[in-house]
Amino acid sequence: MGKKYKESTKLIDRKTLYTPLEAMELALKTAKANFDETIELSIKLGVDPRHADQQVRGAVVLPHGTGKKVRVLVLAKGDRIKEAEDAGADYVGAEEYVEKIQKENWFDFDVVVATPDMMGVVGRLGRILGPKGLMPNPKSGTVTFDVAKAIQEIKAGKVEYRVDKTSIVHVPIGKKSFEVQKLLDNFRVLMEAIIKAKPSAAKGQYLKSVAVSSTMGPGIKINSVKVLE
């Protein structure tokens, strides 16, 4: 355990459930690394992701973005290619990029957007993109003919959330360089989306625990009753 991490843990009472504001302030105070650390939420949900009717997945545009420059690859053809280029996509193409990923193990992108008519080709990448969480999906708005809108939302700070096999959702909500209020705004918008996404099949307590941390900092527990205050 590093010296900076030990110093950070002294600022936190492990038994306390903090208000969102207190937690965001502490997340910034405990971000002591000499780079712009990511501030991330970890939300434990009362769902069993082994069941298809208890999946929690979606996307939301954070009002202040995540602070990360997102590289977008668009797989499209015809008129959609120019539309994607004009909207600010970093890479636009079709089969040539599918082959590049397959043959060269190329991953210089963070999000993939595909038009529905490309999914037959994109389907070949399922085994490669799927485990990395990069496979285009209609639920997250990354399979669409409206590529311009998809790109604009992603560049504006759209984040995807998805419950993992341990029933936890991990989502970045900003950087150490953010003001507390911006983190708080992003936190509230994300929590509203996750609460709305509660599956009808989920029984009992939905928000089991909520914690925030910086890349190198300790977890700070948030009172789940007060997440929308």
Curated annotation (Swiss-Prot):
PROSITE patterns named among the record's database cross-references: RIBOSOMAL_L1 (PS01199)
SUPFAM superfamilies: Ribosomal protein L1
GO MF terms held by the record: rRNA binding; structural constituent of ribosome; tRNA binding
Disulfide-linked positions: none
InterPro entries: Ribosom_uL1_bac-type (IPR005878), Ribosomal_uL1 (IPR002143), Ribosomal_uL1-like (IPR023674), Ribosomal_uL1/biogenesis (IPR028364), Ribosomal_uL1_3-a/b-sand (IPR016095), Ribosomal_uL1_CS (IPR023673)
Subunit field text: Part of the 50S ribosomal subunit.
Protein name per its UniProtKB record: Large ribosomal subunit protein uL1
Species the sequence originates in: Clostridium kluyveri (strain ATCC 8527 / DSM 555 / NBRC 12016 / NCIMB 10680 / K1)
